[in-house]
């Protein structure tokens, strides 16, 4: 018997490939099912295949960079993201139209690009670089922690502020990511408690103003459609006609999920019309088409991905802090998107236009998610190489 055991290529990460493949199938089949109502035609599922193929190319390209190179690129990617948000803000409506009350997309012909989706990945990369470079030996003082907090605030305030002007949902996602990365950075828990408490107080104050003083909320830049979404969520028993119209799509989503039962009605036998069924409410299509079993599979896949990310965070931290903190931010992104999207589909969270990552239709959302996934895949490959080197040395 040979004394040398054949080693598998470090580029083969079977569990991550499995996750990619399962989400690809779920996404394409669900979008195809949603198209049966004819509200989007029957071509969106084909476009989603193209988005996934482009994402696969992006993942492959990212594997040619080592983690140190990606960290160096984080500043440039972050700056490009900031500039794209500024250009979007000042662009005429001919190339940056207002859609559903928000000026969040560039439109060039039939192509639409949402810069805020890519900004989320750029923000995570930049924060991972800043946090990763702070006190790598673990010896820190209160002054060090405050200095790091100021750096994090300096990185986050501009993109979050620019996004908040038009898209409160995405801005909220970014703020959640920042808070999670701050919490995991090792900063003194007392400072974190102050920040978390201040954040909860601020959010509560904003919600209070939106619900009880909508005119005041509008005067400080909060959009009318955002106020309607919040009021329809918290005041279902005392709805105005406008609020009732806003909550109707949630009622339809709940009805669709309920009609699917245990095994679902199949992709060609959908009976409940759900608006935005390929994007915001794709989970309701899964529920009606594949029932409780289909919904459970989706949730289990997200738990599997999150578990894989948590394991990677722990194992790669001694080798590369940038990769570890990027995985922290990416995990936060997956968690909040999944919780918010599924939550609004079952009526426990307000409608915010947040897609179900990996599953919802959309070029910007799918590509940015897969770019982040590519960096995670790269980190997993590099970890395999590190451990193989240590084992064989």
From Swiss-Prot:
Give the main EC class.
Answer: transferase
* Domain of life of the source: Bacteria
**Keywords annotated in UniProt:** Cell membrane, Cell shape, Cell wall biogenesis/degradation, Glycosyltransferase, Membrane, Peptidoglycan synthesis, Transferase, Transmembrane, Transmembrane helix
- Which GO CC terms are listed, alphabetically? cell division site; plasma membrane
Q: What is its main location?
A: membrane
Q: A GO term (biological process) for this protein?
A: cell division
Protein localization: Cell membrane
Q: Report the leader peptide range.
A: none
Variant or mutagenesis effect after changing residue 105 to A: Lack of activity
Q: What is its EC number?
A: 2.4.99.28
Induction entry = Induced by the ECF sigma factor SigM.
One MF term from GO for this chain? Answer: lipid-linked peptidoglycan transporter activity
- How does it sit in the bilayer? Multi-pass membrane protein
Give the catalytic activity. [GlcNAc-(1->4)-Mur2Ac(oyl-L-Ala-gamma-D-Glu-L-Lys-D-Ala-D-Ala)](n)-di-trans,octa-cis-undecaprenyl diphosphate + beta-D-GlcNAc-(1->4)-Mur2Ac(oyl-L-Ala-gamma-D-Glu-L-Lys-D-Ala-D-Ala)-di-trans,octa-cis-undecaprenyl diphosphate = [GlcNAc-(1->4)-Mur2Ac(oyl-L-Ala-gamma-D-Glu-L-Lys-D-Ala-D-Ala)](n+1)-di-trans,octa-cis-undecaprenyl diphosphate + di-trans,octa-cis-undecaprenyl diphosphate + H(+)
Segments crossing the lipid bilayer: 17-37, 45-65, 75-95, 111-131, 146-166, 169-189, 191-211, 285-305, 316-336, 342-362, 363-383
Pathway annotation: Cell wall biogenesis; peptidoglycan biosynthesis
* Remarks, miscellaneous: Increased expression mediated by SigM is both necessary and sufficient to confer intrinsic resistance to moenomycin and viability to cells lacking aPBPs.
Q: What does this protein do?
A: Peptidoglycan polymerase that is essential for cell wall elongation. Also required for the maintenance of the rod cell shape.
> In which family does this protein belong, per the annotation?
Belongs to the SEDS family. MrdB/RodA subfamily.
HAMAP family assigned to the protein according to its UniProt record, in alphabetical order: PGT_RodA (MF_02079)
Q: What is this protein called?
A: Peptidoglycan glycosyltransferase RodA
């Amino acid at each position: 018997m040979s004394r040398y055991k054949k080693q598998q290529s470090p580029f083969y990460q079977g569990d991550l490939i499995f996750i990619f493949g399962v989400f690809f199938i779920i996404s394409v089949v669900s979008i195809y099912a949603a198209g049966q109502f004819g509200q989007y035609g029957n071509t969106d599922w084909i476009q989603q295949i193209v988005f996934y193929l482009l994402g696969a190319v992006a993942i492959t390209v990212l594997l040619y960079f080592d983690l140190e190179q990606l960290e160096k690129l984080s500043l440039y990617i972050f700056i490009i993201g900031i500039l794209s948000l500024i250009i979007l803000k000042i662009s005429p409506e001919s190339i940056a139209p207002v859609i559903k009350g928000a000026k969040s997309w560039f439109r060039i012909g039939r192509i639409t690009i949402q810069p805020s989706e890519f900004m989320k990945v750029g923000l995570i990369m930049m924060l991972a670089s800043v946090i990763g470079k702070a006190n790598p030996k673990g010896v820190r003082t209160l002054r060090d922690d405050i200095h790091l907090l100021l750096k994090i605030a300096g990185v986050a305030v501009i993109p979050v502020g620019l996004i908040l002007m038009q898209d409160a949902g995405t801005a909220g996602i970014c703020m959640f990511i920042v808070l999670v990365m701050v919490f995991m950075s090792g900063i003194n828990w007392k400072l974190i408690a102050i920040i978390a408490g201040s954040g909860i107080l601020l959010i509560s104050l904003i919600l209070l103003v939106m619900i009880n003083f909508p005119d005041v909320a509008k005067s400080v830049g909060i959009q009318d459609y955002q106020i309607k979404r919040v009021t329809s969520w918290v005041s279902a028993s005392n709805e105005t006609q406008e609020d009732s119209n806003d909550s109707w799509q949630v009622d339809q989503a709940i009805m669709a999920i309920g009609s699917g039962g245990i095994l679902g009605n199949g992709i060609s036998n959908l009976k409940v019309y759900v608006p935005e069924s390929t994007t915001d409410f794709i989970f309701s299509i899964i529920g009606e088409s594949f029932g409780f079993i289909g919904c459970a599979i989706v949730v289990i896949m997200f738990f599997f991905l999150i578990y894989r990310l948590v394991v990677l965070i722990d194992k790669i931290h001694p080798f590369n802090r940038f990769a570890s903190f990027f995985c922290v931010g990416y995990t936060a992104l997956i968690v909040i998107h999944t919780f918010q999207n599924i939550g609004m589909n079952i009526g426990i969270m307000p409608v915010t236009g947040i897609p179900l990552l990996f599953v919802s239709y959309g070029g910007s959302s799918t590509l940015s998610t897969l770019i982040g996934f590519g960096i995670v895949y790269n980190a997993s490959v590099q970890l395999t190489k590190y451990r193989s080197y240590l084992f064989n040395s």
